[in-house]
Amino acid sequence: MTFPHRHLLGIEALRPEEINTLLDLADKYAALNRQPDKHADALKGLTQINMFFENSTRTQASFEIAGKRLGADVMNMAMQASSVKKGETLIDTALTLNAMHPDLLVVRHPQSGAVDLLAQKVNCAVLNAGDGRHEHPTQALLDALTIRRAKGRLHRLSIAICGDIAHSRVARSNIMLLGKMENRIRLIGPPTLMPSGISEFGVEVFNDMNAGLKDVDVVMMLRLQKERMDGGFIPSEREYYHRFGLDADKLSNAKPDAIIMHPGPMNRGVEIDGTLADDINRSVIQDQVEMGVAVRMAAMDLLSQNLRLTRGAE
């Protein structure tokens, strides 16, 4: 099975078999990453530019490590000091970079759709590292790989996504991916943080944690995205934790072997009790971080193969 995509802009364009192709390759890279010599040559001779218009620590580091382990020449652009801050448009930036002939662009941007726009203006492969509230495809893919490794499968599971659904690109990408793989998805959160009409996407909506977590296999907690809120979405963090934060009492409604996930960064004592986050028997949060590097290696490997084929045919 090939991966017939020039870019990785979102989950929406991926078919289930393409998702499995990427995850299968990521599994191999996960094994490589545990070896003393973690390097491969899939991106040897290629240039990777990371452009983060939003602050990021873990995602940018993950992409940088992934590129370097595959042999790419990796450049991190300081967008806070770039020409964009001096008035240059995103399109002008894209055209300027395109003239330098990079091979892969990794882009995070605060505006939904900005990465798609940039991809239309360049000749290289583009990976969406998160755009506004729209999508975060590699996060959904690494979550999927984490679930598959922990549960032995990625289908017919009951999965609860809890918290700030309305502002979360992670939730959007996960809903699409997990839905494509025939899972039962439950969304749990206050009405103020639930997108209108979301039940039309084949998910179940709950405003009560105890009811929503009943017999689920996976509990995925989300961060409160305060930077995207422009009003009083919650009474207080203390009240939010009381009603929607994951603690032992609420978790007792899930299956005994249910796993706990969080895309990070975590607000301990707001979305999740710190003891649960560190529970080595239930929490797979650090596994998510580990799988992030493997998934991004797989994504860039597959896109680079198409890039070389395209250039070879020109």
Swiss-Prot record:
Gene3D superfamilies: Aspartate/ornithine carbamoyltransferase. Keywords: Pyrimidine biosynthesis, Transferase. Carbamoyl phosphate binds at R58, T59, R108, H136, Q139, G264, P265. Pfam families: OTCace, OTCace_N. HAMAP family: Asp_carb_tr. This is Aspartate carbamoyltransferase catalytic subunit. One of its GO terms (molecular function) is amino acid binding. One of its GO terms (biological process) is amino acid metabolic process. L-aspartate binds at K86, R169, R223. Belongs to the aspartate/ornithine carbamoyltransferase superfamily. ATCase family. Heterododecamer (2C3:3R2) of six catalytic PyrB chains organized as two trimers (C3), and six regulatory PyrI chains organized as three dimers (R2). It catalyses: carbamoyl phosphate + L-aspartate = N-carbamoyl-L-aspartate + phosphate + H(+). One of its GO terms (cellular component) is cytosol.
